Amino acid sequence: MTETQAGGRRLINATAVMASGTMVSRVLGLVRAMLIAFVLGNGTRQVEAFNYANTVPTTLYLLLAGGTLNNVLVPQIVRAVTHDEDGGRAFVDRIITAFVMALGALTVVVTVTTPLVMSMFARAWTAPDMADHWASLLLMSYICMPQLFFYGVFFLIGQVLNARDKFGPMMWAPIANNVVSIAVFALYLAIWGNQTALTGEPFTVPQAWLLAGGSTLGIIVQTLVLLPFLKRAGFSYRPRFDLKGTGLGRTFHVAKWMVGYVALTTLVQMLVANLASQATSATDQGAGWTVYQNAYLIWILPHSLLTVSLATAMLPSASRYAVAGDRSGVAAETTRALRLATTFLLPASVALLVLADPVTRLAFGNGTGASDYIYIAWALMAFAIGLVPFTIQYLYLRAFFAMDNTRTPFLLQIWISGANAAAALALALPWNDPTTVAARLALAYSLSYFVGVFITHFVLRRRLPELPGTATVRHLARLLLATVPAAVL
């Protein structure tokens, strides 16, 4: 078996393990979202309050720290394992110590400034006539903000395992979180039923504590599940505070561009969240943040099942090629992952476009959500247009990260974020229709990735001359020709 064939077999095997865990986790996540829609609806103020409180900490983590952990640390750990005499053990100990301290400080600051943070994401809710709903949102946000720390620890442990080629645990652990969350909403349904959101009133204090506290508990459980796997992988952590002159400076130098990258994404996310918040601040029901997030949840499912798993398996291998100076190997790994991903995701994007109505009706059209599921269908159709360029862009960026290059992704993100912001403002502001706000914002998101992938391909090809361009276009064209007739029928 050639090295290329072995690499392909290894990539497929690792992807299968991760995809199976991701599939179970995403299915349970969808069940959770369906239960939320059944209990609280899709466009009510109660469901908006819960989702703003619960998703803002997650968004902050993924944008402020998650990108650094996912895309900077793995290549750095692989480099340390390859070159350090102790196999990278001391380096990883220092990485964990430094990031846990930083995450702890960040969590304290964000929790103390919760009113300011939440006003950045949902300014329309600070209006005087929304005072009761704003107070309910803040209570839930205070309870949810500690999730930021536990998300950080979870992803940090997960990346240590990934760098040791132990990919499965990180993809399977979120199942525990979803089980806890489903149990919490089942308890809420048993106590208060599914009519509370229709009253237009904010959550009571016990309701807020149950839902927000349950969400935070789920993240804690998800993190604890990883600890036995870390021990089984032969890793034992020892805090190390001798951080100077140990190579961490290089890691944080690489990470600074990722901080800029995520800062741009954060600003656009805030803009989108604020535009979405207007849908339910002006009326009791509209296609706001929850509709946008639920459509995104369905849209991202095929990407999460395949592309994320492919990229996670690809990154350590591509990083090893990059460390060895083998740019052809990096190009081959990227191309292999891209062809595998698009072979499945282009048909998936067409299917989402055609089947948006029945899929969203089945998932979110029951109970309290029966009257407003169609908002999600419209947003899902808008998202579906951008699935393929989003996937290609995602894999292209991993090639840059494997080559220890985070500066170029930051510069490329300027174009994507700028296009997203401009399109969001152009599509959201001129029309005063609260039922289509989420769909217009989703379309803006999709259009921005067409801009991004076009620019990124030419920039990456300068560094990887063997990266195919015309062959990729022909591959996509053949897939489209094979898929469209089936969709029409």
Language-model features and meaning:
Residues M1-L489:
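Membrane-embedded alpha-helical bundles of multi-pass transporters/translocases
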